[in-house]
Amino acid sequence: PYKFFVRQGASDKLLIYLQGGGACWFRQTCDPEMTPSYTLNVANTSYPYFGIFNFAKADNPFKDHTVVYAPYCTGDVHIGASDTIYPPVEEGQKDLVIRHQGRANMQAVLEWTYANVKSPKNIFVTGSSAGAIPSPFYASLIADHYPDARVGQLGDGAGGYRRMNQATRPHEQWGMFNFIKDEKGFEHLNSHDMNYESLYIAAAQ
């Protein structure tokens, strides 16, 4: 089961944060028994009380916000929609199924938010590293749901993920195109030309 954190604050101020933590799209980096490059489980995730989450700091611009914090454990930068089979790469291994279901986890976050934060006036959507990559996509969805709100978005640390090539197309392993073309503003995306900047450009347009 997935879990996320909520800090109740002002009803008109909302901060949504997507946790970072690596990603995987090869057997070697997805397999927990090899060299996994992502957080495997959110069961022991604890809420951070530093940086923008240090609400005791007088100069924290988010100290009064309601905060929804989305932990990350799916290896798909929060935008996967596939139970992907990774075949063996070493003798004695069996097929490995990784549940790249970050989109479903984020949908749970959004559904709770929509049901419990009715009319925010100011919304800020952000994330770090792997959480920065999908933040414009989710900011776009959130802006559509709250048309009267002022929505800002900032991706912190996504710049290290550069343009993909034919040998490195993680969004295909993650099943991102199982859903993203159904969302308004993202219909024109295609797997061949996809890069992470595409999400920022589509959200801005």
Question: Which stretches of residues belong to each language-model region?
Answer:
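Surface cap/lid and interfacial helix-loop subdomains adjacent to catalytic sites
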Residues: 1, 83-84, 97-124, 139-205
